A protein has these predicted regions:
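Adenylate-forming
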Residues: 1, 16-19, 96, 126, ...
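ANL superfamily adenylate-forming
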Residues: 2-46, 55, 64-77, 153-154
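Conserved AMP-binding/adenylation subdomain of ANL enzymes
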Residues: 67-91, 99-138, 153
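Thr-Gly-centered strand-to-loop micro-motif
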Residues: 61, 94-95, 119-120, 170-172
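A short helix->loop->beta-strand "cap" motif at the edges of active sites that frequently abuts
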Residues: 5-11, 115, 164-167, 188
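Short beta-strand->loop structural element characteristic of the AMP-binding/adenylate-forming
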Residues: 1, 10, 58-60, 116-122
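Conserved G/P- and acidic residue-centered "switch" motifs that form tight phosphate/ATP-binding loops
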Residues: 52, 114, 173
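Conserved S/T- and glycine-rich ATP-binding loop of Class I adenylate-forming
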Residues: 49-52, 92, 98, 132, ...
Length: 188
């Protein structure tokens, strides 16, 4: 908080009922302009090291010298490579901690593009299927181990959930052999 020159923490909720200790979003925005501020800047995400040589540390990066609208177009362009368009009704499931760079970027990009984001407190294979079914999840970002654990679930467990809403699953962090990418693909 010292870096942003404030001694207050803003806690707010978006939704039907405010949580204890928070203020409803409409109360915070009442009387505020509806147009972007004239001096706005792009900002930058704080990424974290893996912590292999100690505790994870935040890595402060420079602010990109791009207009915020240009940065938004870059976010949109990145996800369009995967067939994900701005404001097209996608629901992104985040099942890993946001301190992982790729997870934070996919989640942040989804929010920038106007998509709904569903956060999991703790990832489990069946928990993921349940959320896909309940929220109509269309995209997610996972590591190959998560794919393996999903495929290791018994068929009767997998069959309980409707996952027809899924349009794009992206993996990173480790190689994923081609024969594991598609369960019906023949082994090489």
């Amino acid at each position: 908080l010292d870096e942003i020159d404030t001694d207050a923490v803003a806690c707010f909720t978006v939704g039907a009922e405010p949580l204890p200790g928070t203020r409803p979003w409409p109360e915070l925005t009442e009387g505020q302009p509806t147009t972007p501020p004239p001096d706005r800047t792009t900002g930058s995400a704080m990424h974290y090291t893996s912590g292999t040589t100690g505790r994870p540390k935040g890595v402060k990066r420079g602010i990109p010298e791009l207009e915020p609208d240009v940065m938004g177009e870059l976010y949109a362009g990145f996800q369009q490579m995967f067939g994900v368009q701005p404001r097209d009704g996608h629901v992104h499931l985040t099942g890993s901690p946001l301190y992982h760079t790729a997870v934070l970027m996919w989640t942040g990009n989804s929010l920038h593009l106007g998509h709904t984001v569903v956060l999991m407190d703790k990832w489990t294979p069946e928990g993921m299927l349940e959320r896909i079914d309940r929220y109509g999840v269309s995209t997610s970002h996972m590591v190959p181990t998560q794919f393996h654990r999903l495929l290791a679930l018994p068929e009767d467990v997998r069959a309980r959930y409707d996952v027809s809403s899924v349009r794009c699953m992206v993996h990173a962090a480790a190689p994923c052999p081609p024969w594991r990418r598609v369960p019906s693909a023949p082994a090489a």
